[in-house]
Curated annotation (Swiss-Prot):
InterPro entries: UPF0767
GO CC annotations, alphabetized: membrane
Residue ranges of the TM segments: 15-34
Matches recorded under PANTHER family: SMALL INTEGRAL MEMBRANE PROTEIN 12
Coiled coil: none
Membrane topology: Single-pass membrane protein
Lineage of producing organism: Eukaryota, Metazoa, Chordata, Craniata, Vertebrata
Domain of life: Eukaryota
Subcellular location: Membrane
Keywords: Membrane, Transmembrane, Transmembrane helix
Organism: Canis lupus familiaris
Pfam families: UPF0767
Gene transcribed to yield this protein: SMIM12
Similarity comment: Belongs to the SMIM12 family.
Protein name as catalogued: Small integral membrane protein 12
Length: 92
């Protein structure tokens, strides 16, 4: 009787193994969930560097007065005076 049973199990091993593995996995999963208990509340995620940078830039923009701008005469002088006028005594 045992040799016949082992021959049948060996022949149909793929069909027997999958349901057994499925049942063992399901029981283990639920047993672990039962032992572990209720999941803790997820911790608050830390902001990414780009999000912190955007927040900082928005805070800087809120603190500025956008009606006060630099005059166009000051903007035309785009290079430092010390570099270009070093050898021109008439402009100093």
């Amino acid at each position: 009787m045992w040799p016949v049973l082992w021959t049948v199990v060996r022949t149909y091993a793929p069909y027997v193994t999958f349901p057994v593995a499925f049942v063992v996995g399901a029981v283990g999963y639920h047993l672990e969930w039962f032992i572990r208990g209720k999941d803790p509340q997820p911790a608050e995620e830390e902001k990414s560097i780009s999000e912190r940078r955007e927040d900082r830039k928005l805070d800087e923009l809120l603190g500025k007065d956008h009606t006060q701008v630099v005059s166009l005469k000051d903007k035309l002088e785009f290079a430092p005076k010390a570099v270009l006028n070093r050898n021109r005594p008439e402009k100093n």
